[in-house]
Amino acid sequence: MGKRKELKDNDVEMGGTGRPVEDDESDEVMDIVNVDFEWFDPQPAVDFHGLKNLLRQLFDADSQIFDLSALTDLILAQPLLGSTVKVDGNESDPYAFLTVLNLQEHKDKPVIKDLTSYLQRKASSNPSLAPLSQLLSQSPIPPIGLILTERLINMPAEVVPPMYSMLLEEIAWAIEDKEPYNFSHYLIVSKTYEEVESKLDMEESRPQKKKKKSGSNVERFFFHPEDEVFERHAICSGSIEYTHKHDDGLSDSKRAFQDLGIKTSGSLILIDGPKLEAAVKDVTDYVKPPV
């Protein structure tokens, strides 16, 4: 399968990566940073550590459960599928990435076995994820495309649509070449959070947020704004509790999130295979910057 990615040759200039100024901080000065982003194929020679760190961020407290090195190697073993986003050229670390892994094709690999078992177990604990739990329990497992994507916390959502658009093209070309990427479903692994009373005596600073009720009058916020759109197209979606818990209010030097008085949770979104393209179009419109 030949790579036919062109967007990496066209820089996209975006600014305003900080959060909006709220009423109680009107006297603060907002910094606007203009950055040119470039899209690249995954590069086995340079992207291993950057992708592994982003995977650790994605799986949060439960990242220790998985062999992230093996998972990173699996992502890099299909360099013609998926994208990274960088700002300092191809040899620099990725600021964002997106890829898809075939759970059926890789079912015998230990890291995929662990992931599939984990996802099935978590889905079975949330009634809203019952359709996903049933799919993951089938033997053999259906050709589910596991979408893994993460980015640095202040990366603008505008980098997302090009990654998904290129992924759809690459999947179509792979299917033409009779490669195993004809997915029945797509499963997006992501993260949400809830605000909790912070035990830290410091000024609160939240990530940009999109609200969604999750029951019991608790607001659920999206780290990835596009997830709100994907959930509208989903067969099912819902939050999952991490196996390993963060202490309330714990300051974690590797995750600024814990300094902000928030509780993070995993998020799973199951989309019917043929419906992903329409979902991506809606995401493109949703994150489009105002004219």
Swiss-Prot record:
Protein's name according to its UniProt entry: Protein bcp1
Biased composition (Basic and acidic residues): 1-11
InterPro entries, A to Z: BCP1_family (IPR025602)
Keywords: Cytoplasm, Nucleus, Protein transport, Transport
Biological process per Gene Ontology, one example term: protein transport
Annotated family: Belongs to the BCP1 family.
Keyword field contains Protein transport: yes
PANTHER family named among the record's database cross-references: BRCA2 AND CDKN1A INTERACTING PROTEIN (PTHR13261), BRCA2 AND CDKN1A-INTERACTING PROTEIN (PTHR13261:SF0)
Localization of this protein: Cytoplasm; Nucleus
Domain of life: Eukaryota
Record's function text: Involved in nuclear export, actin cytoskeleton organization and vesicular transport.
Cellular component GO terms held in the UniProt record: cytoplasm; nucleus
Region of interest: Disordered: 1-25
